[in-house]
Swiss-Prot record:
Name of the protein in question: Protein SEY1
GO terms assigned for molecular function: GTP binding; GTPase activity
Top-level taxonomic group: Eukaryota
The gene coding this protein: SEY1
Annotated EC: 3.6.5.-
Regions of this protein lying in the Cytoplasmic compartment: 1-749, 795-872
Pfam families: RHD3_GTPase (PF05879), Sey1_3HB (PF20428)
C-alpha cells in the first residue's frame, strides 16, 4: 500500500503540510474531522461561494477508485499495493482537484471547472467490515446529501452482475434519495450517476453496456417501496446518467492516459439543450457534466459546518432532513457573518458613540461632524458584506438574519441619529436665544427703534435652516427612522415657545421702561401739584401766570394728570408692542399690568408726599401764604393797629380744612373716590400666575385683598389726622406769637423832654444844614426817598436785603478769622478748647431745608429715569 505523508487524518496535529494532498473527512470509527474548514481555507475554497463542485466515488473495495481519482484529478489518495489485496481507503477522504487543465496546450474550452472537491469513499463489499453494511449506508447517504456527481467505478466484466456492478449499493443510494426527497419536496434535488467502466476493451459497445446498466437500475427502482405519493415516480425524476469507458491501466497505459485526459474535459460547467429533449421533455446535457440543478446550494464557507451537521444526523440514526440542516447551517453561518460584520461596524461607529456619550454626560451635547456619512458608509458596507457572504444560504434564514442585523445596526444608528438631532436641537435653541438677545441689545445701543418680530422671524428661519441642514447630513437612506419631521416639528414648536418667552420677556422689559417713564412723569407732576398747595390765595407758591388752582380740586387734577399720563404710556406701549408681533391677549395683559403698576407708582408718590414731615411743611407753607401775605401776594408788615388775631384765625382755619381734604382721595365733582376698579378693569383671562406674582394688591380691585375702594383711597388715618392737627396748631401758634412780638416791638415811647433836649443840643447842626444848600438838598432827597419807599411798601425787602448783606459779611468775616486762627498755633489751641460747646437747633425751617434737599435728590433720580427712558 502506498500512503502519502501529506494527508491530514482525524486527530492529526494542525500543520499546513498535512493539507497538501487532502484531508480525512470521516475516519473508520465514524468520527468527523473538525479540521475540514481549515483545509478548505488552505485550498482557498472558502471564499468561492457557490463556485465549487463536489464529486464522490463509489465502488467495491480494491477496484481502483483511488487510482482513478488520482489519474483523473491529480490527487494523491492512498492506493493499494500490487503485492497484497486489502482495504486501503478507510472512511471518507477529500482532496481538491490538482489538475486544472486536461493537458498542456489545450485551449480554455477544455479547462476543468474551478474548485472541484473529490471525495474518496471507503469501498463496499470488503472483508474488513463483512456483513456490517451500516457504514456503507451512512457513507452513501452522506455522499448523496453533499455531492453533485456520484462516480460509480465498475469493471466491464461486472456489468450485468448484482453485487459486482454495485447494484446493492445503488439500491441503497436510491432508497436514501427517496428518503431525502421525502423531506425536501420543495427543491427536488437531482444528482448525476456517472458510471466509469474500467478495463473497457471495446468488444461490447459502450451503448450496450449503458442499456444493460439502465435496465438494471430501472428494475431496482421499480422494486423499491416508495413513499406515498411517489408510487409512479421514475428514476429519471431524480437522477441523470452518464457513462464512460477507460482501457486497462496496466495493459494499455498510453491509451488509458489519453482516455483519462479526454474524460477530464467533461468535468466542467454544462447546460441542457432545450432543442434536444427526451420523452419527458428534459433537455440533453451539453458541454460539461456540472449542471446548476445538481448543486446543493451550500456556500463553500459553510460546507464544513453543513457536512458536520449532516454526518451528525446520519451517525445518530436520526431522520436526515436536508432543508432543516440547510436552515441550521444558514443560521449558524449568518450569525458568524453577522458577528464579523459587526466588528467592522463597531470600529467605524464606536468613536462617535463614545464622543456623543461623553458630551451628554458632561451636560453639553455636541453636533458631531461627519456623523451622517460615517453612519451611511458603515451601514452600507455592513449590509453589503453580509449580503455577499450570507445571501448564498437559505433564503428565508438569510432574510431573517439580515433583518436582525439591520435591526441591530439601525438601533445603534438611530440612537446616534436621535442624539445628533437632540444636540442640534439644544444648540439651535441656545444660539437662537443668544442671537435674538444680541440683536435686541444692538438695537438698544444704537438708540434706534428695532422690530423685535422681524428679528425673531429672521433668527427663527436661520435656526430652522441650520437644523434641517444638520438633520439631512445625519440621514441614513432607506431607513424609516431617518424621517426627522417629528423632531423638526418639535424643534419648531420649541422655537415658537422660546420666541414667545423672549417676546414676553421683552414686553416685560418694555413695561418696566414704560413704568419708569410713568414714574418720572408722575413724580414731577405730583411734586408740582403738592407744592402748589396754598397758592390759591397767592403768595410765594403761586404760579406767575395762568389760573391759580384751588385746593379743593387737588385730587381732580391729580387723577386727570394720572389718567392722561397712563394713557400716553399705554399708547407708547401699544405702538412698541406692535413691533413685537404680540397677540391681542399679550397686549391686554401688558396694559392691565401697566395700569396696576402705575397706580402703585402714584400711590407711592402720594404716600411720600403724605409723610409726617412733608405734610406738616405743606400745612405751614399754606398757613404762611395766607397769614404773612395779603391777597395780592404782598408780604405783611405787622403794625400795632393791625387785626392780627382775625387774620391768624382765618388762615389757621383755612389751612385746617386741608387735612380732611388731603386725607381722602376724592373727586370734587362727584365727592367720591375715582373709579379705580373700572379704570384698571378685570384680570384678563390670558393672564398667568407669573403675570400676577409681582403685582401689589389693590383694595377695591382685588377681592382677596379684603380692602374696599374707600379704604384704598384713604391717604391719612384718623389718628394721624388728629396728630397733624395738634402739631400744626402748635406751629401756627408759634408763627402768630412771632408776628405779635414783631408788631409790639415796633412801638417806641419817646419822652417829650427828649425833643427839647434834641433841639437844644442840635441847634447848631440844624442851622448849619439850613444855611448850606448842599446839606439841605441832600436832606430833602433823603426825605423824598424815604417817603416813596414807604408808599411802595419796600421797607420790608430793603431791611431783609440789608440783613442778608450783613449776614454775608459776618460769614465772610468768620471765614477770614478761621483761616487766620488755623494758620497760627495759638488759634488752633483756642479752636480745640471750643469743640463740643456748639448745640444744634431744629425748627420747621430746618425741616424745610431737609425736604428741599430730599426733593432735589428725588428730582435727580427722576431726571436719571427720564434719561433712561428717552426713547419713550
Amino acid at each position: 500500500m502506498v500512503a502519502n505523508g501529506h494527508f491530514a487524518g482525524v486527530g492529526d496535529v494542525l500543520d499546513a503540510k498535512n493539507y497538501e494532498h487532502g484531508v480525512q473527512v470521516i475516519d473508520e470509527e465514524k468520527e468527523f474531522n473538525p479540521n475540514l474548514s481549515n483545509y478548505l481555507s488552505y485550498e482557498n475554497v472558502t471564499p468561492a461561494g457557490f463556485n465549487y463542485h463536489l464529486i464522490s466515488v463509489f465502488g467495491s473495495q480494491s477496484t481502483g477508485k483511488s487510482t482513478l481519482l488520482n489519474s483523473l484529478f491529480g490527487t494523491h489518495f492512498s492506493v493499494m499495493s500490487e503485492t497484497e489485496r486489502r482495504q486501503t481507503t478507510k472512511g471518507i477522504w477529500l482532496s481538491k482537484n490538482k489538475r486544472l487543465k486536461s493537458d498542456k496546450g489545450q485551449d480554455n474550452q477544455t479547462k476543468m471547472a474551478d474548485n472541484i472537491l473529490v471525495m474518496d469513499v471507503e469501498g463496499t463489499d470488503g472483508r474488513e467490515r463483512g456483513e456490517d453494511q451500516d457504514f456503507e449506508r451512512k457513507s452513501a447517504l452522506f455522499a448523496l446529501a453533499t455531492s453533485e456527481v456520484l462516480i460509480v467505478n465498475i469493471w466491464e466484466h461486472q456489468v450485468g452482475l448484482y453485487q459486482g456492478a454495485n447494484m446493492g449499493l445503488l439500491k441503497t443510494v436510491f432508497e436514501v434519495n427517496l428518503e431525502l426527497f421525502l423531506k425536501d419536496k420543495r427543491s427536488n434535488p437531482r444528482s448525476l450517476l456517472f458510471f466509469v467502466i474500467r478495463d473497457f476493451l471495446g468488444t461490447t459497445p459502450l451503448q450496450n453496456l449503458q442499456n444493460t446498466l439502465l435496465q438494471d437500475l430501472n428494475r431496482i427502482w421499480n422494486s423499491l417501496s416508495k413513499p406515498a405519493g411517489l408510487e409512479n415516480s421514475s428514476i429519471t425524476d431524480y437522477f441523470d446518467f452518464a457513462f464512460a469507458g477507460l482501457p486497462h491501466k496496466n495493459f494499455q497505459p498510453e491509451k488509458f492516459v489519453d482516455e483519462v485526459r479526454k474524460l477530464s474535459t467533461r468535468f466542467c460547467d454544462g447546460h441542457r439543450d432545450p432543442n434536444k429533449t427526451d420523452a419527458k421533455g428534459t433537455g440533453s446535457i451539453e458541454g460539461g457534466i456540472f449542471l446548476p440543478e445538481y448543486h446543493r446550494r451550500i456556500p463553500a464557507d459553510g460546507f464544513a459546518v453543513y457536512a458536520e451537521g449532516i454526518w451528525d444526523q446520519i451517525v445518530n440514526n436520526k431522520d436526515l432532513d436536508l432543508p432543516t440542516q440547510q436552515e441550521l447551517l444558514a443560521q449558524f453561518r449568518c450569525d458568524e457573518i453577522s458577528r464579523e460584520v459587526l466588528v467592522a461596524f463597531d470600529e467605524a461607529i464606536s468613536p462617535f458613540e463614545a464622543k456623543q456619550a461623553e458630551a451628554v454626560q458632561a451636560g453639553n451635547p455636541q453636533v458631531l461632524g461627519g456623523l451622517g456619512s460615517a453612519m451611511c458608509n458603515a451601514r452600507m458596507k455592513s449590509v453589503k458584506n453580509f449580503d455577499t457572504e450570507a445571501s448564498r444560504y437559505h433564503k428565508r434564514v438569510y432574510q431573517m438574519k439580515k433583518s436582525e442585523l439591520q435591526d441591530k445596526i439601525d438601533s445603534r444608528l438611530k440612537a446616534l441619529f436621535l442624539g445628533q438631532l437632540s444636540a442640534a436641537h439644544r444648540s439651535g435653541i441656545q444660539e437662537f436665544t443668544e442671537s435674538v438677545t444680541a440683536a435686541v441689545k444692538a438695537g438698544q445701543k444704537r438708540g434706534a427703534s428695532y422690530d423685535f418680530a422681524e428679528i425673531v422671524t429672521k433668527e427663527r428661519k436661520l435656526a430652522i435652516e441650520k437644523f434641517e441642514k444638520e438633520a439631512r447630513a445625519a440621514v441614513v437612506e432607506d431607513t424609516q427612522w431617518s424621517n426627522y419631521q417629528q423632531e423638526l416639528s418639535l424643534y419648531q414648536k420649541d422655537l415658537e415657545n422660546i420666541g414667545g418667552q423672549l417676546r414676553r420677556d421683552e414686553m416685560r422689559r418694555l413695561a418696566t421702561r414704560v413704568g419708569r417713564w410713568v414714574r418720572s412723569r408722575l413724580g414731577e407732576s405730583i411734586d408740582l401739584e403738592f407744592n402748589a398747595i396754598g397758592s390759591g390765595r397767592g403768595g410765594s407758591g403761586a404760579p406767575e401766570f395762568g389760573d391759580k388752582p384751588s385746593e379743593k380740586s387737588l385730587w381732580d387734577r391729580v387723577w386727570t394728570l394720572f389718567v392722561d399720563t397712563v394713557l400716553d404710556a399705554e399708547r407708547r406701549f401699544t405702538e412698541r408692542a406692535s413691533s413685537f408681533d404680540a397677540s391681542i391677549d399679550e397686549v391686554d395683559v401688558g396694559l392691565w399690568r401697566l395700569r396696576r403698576k402705575s397706580w402703585g407708582v402714584l400711590r407711592a408718590k402720594i404716600d411720600e408726599e403724605m409723610m409726617e414731615g412733608n405734610i406738616l411743611l405743606k400745612l405751614r407753607e399754606n398757613f404762611e401764604d395766607k397769614f404773612r401775605y395779603d391777597d395780592a401776594g404782598v408780604p405783611r408788615i405787622w403794625r400795632p393797629n393791625d387785626d392780627i388775631e382775625s387774620i391768624y384765625t382765618r388762615a389757621r382755619e383755612s389751612t385746617l380744612t386741608l387735612i380732611p381734604l388731603l386725607s381722602r382721595f376724592r373727586l370734587a365733582e362727584t365727592n367720591a373716590p375715582p373709579p379705580l376698579d373700572k379704570w384698571i378693569g378685570h384680570t384678563p383671562s390670558s393672564a398667568t400666575p407669573a403675570d400676577e406674582e409681582d403685582l401689589t394688591p389693590i383694595g377695591g380691585v382685588d377681592e382677596d385683598e379684603g380692602k374696599s375702594l374707600e379704604e384704598e383711597m384713604t391717604m391719612i388715618g384718623e389718628a394721624k389726622k388728629q396728630d397733624l392737627t395738634v402739631r400744626f396748631k402748635k406751629t401756627a401758634d408759634g408763627v402768630y406769637v412771632e408776628a405779635k412780638r414783631s408788631a409790639i416791638g415796633g412801638i417806641t415811647q419817646v419822652p417829650l423832654y427828649f425833643y427839647g433836649l434834641l433841639l437844644a443840643l442840635g441847634w447848631n447842626e440844624i442851622v448849619a444844614v439850613l444855611r448850606n444848600p448842599a446839606y439841605f438838598l441832600l436832606l430833602f432827597v433823603c426825605a423824598v426817598t424815604a417817603y416813596v419807599t414807604y408808599q411802595l411798601n419796600l421797607w420790608g425787602p430793603i431791611i431783609k436785603m440789608t440783613e442778608a448783606a450783613s449776614q454775608q459779611a459776618l460769614m465772610e468775616g468768620k471765614t477770614r478769622l478761621r483761616e487766620f486762627l488755623e494758620a497760627s498755633d495759638t488759634g488752633l489751641q483756642a479752636m480745640a478748647m471750643s469743640k463740643g460747646r456748639n448745640a444744634e437747633e431744629y425748627d420747621m425751617s430746618n425741616m424745610k431745608n431737609r425736604k428741599s434737599a430730599g426733593g432735589f435728590q428725588n428730582n435727580r433720580s427722576h431726571i436719571d429715569d427720564a434719561d433712561d427712558d428717552d426713547d419713550f
